Amino acid sequence: MKTRHNFNKDLRMDLACSDYFRPVFSYIHFKDGCAYACDTHILVKNKLSECSTFTEEEIEKLDGKFIGSKAYKSILSYDMVQVTDMGFECILYDNQKVIYPFSEVYKYPEMENVISEHLKESTEGITKLRIDPSFFSKIEKALFNFEYAYMQLSEGNKSLLVKSKDSDSIGIIMLKSI
């Protein structure tokens, strides 16, 4: 049986950060043991100790680093990946290595502030919601443990929170006005 040392193979965080018109939203940001991905319509936060097999030391090396969504998608295809100071070192079957270096991003939104603002539960009644159905497909693939998730409206009905009961993963879908 093959051993995998990488992100969960089915965790497609790259789908939650592919904004062609806003390049800053085409990166996955690693901070405080979590991975954040956002395209301004959806946001996901996954705890690295839950959604990967990286060691605590490797998770610490990721702190404050960024990787492009296309590089992340490529990294998922490898079974053996090590986190180094330079980036992700992917080991091929013949012991050759491919390195995906960390990206430099100079101005990235503080996603934890966005999350805490949207964590307040809704106190208003709501009669209509408008959600792009493709957001559900993206967040299902980008959020760890989605099958155990539930949804709730945020205060002011600005967003739909997607929380997993069995992990610290959280997703946010920004709602549209009707």
Where are these regions (language model features)?
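DNA polymerase processivity clamps
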Residues: 1-178
